[in-house]
Design a protein with these regions (language model features):
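Noncatalytic, helix-rich "gating/capping" subdomain that lines the substrate-entry/channel surface
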Residues: 93-382
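Intrinsically disordered, low-complexity linker/terminal regions across diverse proteins
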Residues: 262-265, 284-288, 352, 356-360, ...
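Bacterial signal peptide processing site
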Residues: 19-21
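Bacterial N-terminal signal peptides that target proteins for export
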Residues: 1-7
């Protein structure tokens, strides 16, 4: 599992900030000068009419949503301080000659090398585009699809390694519906004005991708319509959001042989082996009807349309790491039209978000050395144990709970894992091949590392200590 440094560190900074608050001399119970909640009120609003605005309106007015955000909370404000600290760590790591600091520094170098990205345009993904062009039949395209999955480009379907929902002691391979460029099936079929506008914006974006690949206006439009037709077919076979909430309907364990019968075109044994998934004889399929239709779509769609489908999703997945024109088209749709942000974050913040996703624990190791000493971890660990002791006392005082039930509650309380500040054992990223090369190649390398890290868990007990 990828651990988010930004989330964990922001929580740590929030704890520290709360701990440092002290009551200002002269404040009263009615108007505590240091009471953030008190000062964030909007007293022009009656709490009887709109309690939310009364309680939060002052803070909302004082903190307008930035142009590069679609929402803004106190958590975002804390994260701004964290961004500055992480940027400082990265800049210092540029000088490192070895260790995890060098890996962090090399990633930051490629992430901030916008000049190379601008000059190379789509060249960094030329190997993948060439592989798609050379795949002249369905089986060859499916091999490319498997390779793209390993690199983090989601095409066709979603696969992941998670705890088995019916046997939480082991890890299992899950296969779920996917392969769409819009968030879920509703975006393909709802007819309200907002969804229709998003769908039209998506068509324009798809057309712009094919134009960037060299198609003239008419051909780009034709390719976009064919692409949308394929995705709409997959969306129609996908379950609605409310149907995805049923854990029993979305848990269908079957053998790989049964999966081959359900969706034979993918030839799952070959596909899994190509993705270095070995020794797996059962999988958990979330939506079997989707895989049945996926099989029909793969068999019934012309190879050139499938090639364009892979090309589009390759560029969609890598656009944030390429030149400004490619990213600009991507942001216009996914950032502005879909998400509501008026402008993108500064590049350095976007790259920190990316680094957090791919190298969060590596960056975190450097972060805690500078900003979160062992003494802080020990202090918060004691706080967790104090909470555990308080819960035990409360259980002891319950008169409605039997002694036998209390014993079970004590056992559960004692076995609850505490994870404070940072892991006791850090992941080993030494095999992740990060170099001073085009950013997208580092992204592929990191995703490849994470893919193999996850599939290596299959069939093994759950690591309860993993962050």
């Amino acid at each position: 599992m990828r651990h988010s440094l930004l989330t964990a560190a922001a929580a740590t900074l929030l704890l520290a900030a709360c701990q440092q608050q002290t009551k200002v001399a002269g404040s009263t119970a009615d108007s505590p000068a240091s009471d953030i909640l008190y000062n964030d009120r909007d007293t022009s609003v009656s709490p009887r009419e709109d309690f939310f605005e009364y309680a939060n309106g002052g803070w909302i007015k004082a903190h307008p949503i930035p142009e590069d955000q679609s929402s803004w909370t106190i958590g975002h404000a804390i994260q701004e301080d964290l961004y500055v600290r992480l940027r400082s760590i990265n800049e210092e790591s540029l000088k490192a000659s070895g260790g995890i600091e060098k890996k962090v520094g090399d990633f930051w170098y490629s992430a901030m090398d916008s000049a190379t990205a601008q000059s190379q345009k789509l060249q960094p993904i030329a190997p993948e585009l060439d592989a798609i062009a050379k795949a002249g039949d369905l089986n060859s395209l499916l091999a490319v699809m498997a390779d793209l999955q390993v690199k983090g480009v989601g095409v066709g379907y979603n696969a992941g390694v998670y705890q088995d929902a019916k046997n939480s002691d082991v890890m299992a391979l899950y296969l779920n519906q996917g392969g769409l460029g819009l968030p879920n099936r509703d975006y393909y079929f709802n007819s309200d004005a907002r969804t229709t506008g998003i769908r039209n914006g998506y068509q324009q974006y798809v057309r712009s991708v094919f134009a960037a690949l060299g198609a003239d206006s008419a051909t780009a439009q034709q390719k976009a319509l064919a692409h949308l037709s394929l995705e709409t077919r997959l969306a129609k076979a996908s379950r609605k959001l409310e149907d995805l909430r049923d854990p029993y309907r979305n848990y269908n364990k079957m053998t790989v042989d049964a999966l081959n019968s359900l969706c034979p075109s993918i030839r799952w044994k070959d596909a899994l082996q190509r993705q270095d998934v070995h020794g797996v004889d059962t999988v958990i399929v979330g939506q079997p009807e989707f895989y049945k239709e996926l099989d029909a779509a793969l068999r019934g769609t012309p190879v050139p349309v499938l090639q364009d489908y892979l090309r589009f999703h390759l560029i969609r997945a890598t656009a944030p790491y390429l030149d400004s024109a490619t990213y600009g088209s991507y942001f216009t749709f996914y950032g502005k039209t879909l998400r509501g942000a008026n402008q993108p974050k500064p590049r350095w913040k976007r790259m920190l978000d990316l680094e957090d996703n791919l190298l969060g624990e590596a960056l975190g190791k450097v972060f805690v050395q500078e900003f979160f000493p062992q003494e802080a971890k020990d202090r918060y660990t004691r706080m967790v144990e104090d909470i555990r002791s308080a819960l035990k006392e409360r259980i002891q005082q319950l008169d409605w709970m039997s002694d036998s039930t209390k014993q079970k509650a004590y056992t559960k309380l004692a076995t609850m894992k505490k994870k404070v500040g940072y892991p006791d054992k850090w992941k080993d990223f030494s095999a992740m091949k990060i170099e001073r090369q085009p950013l997208v190649r580092n992204v592929f390398a990191a995703n490849n590392w994470w893919h193999h890290y996850e599939v290596n868990k299959l069939g093994k007990p759950v690591d309860r200590d993993e962050w």
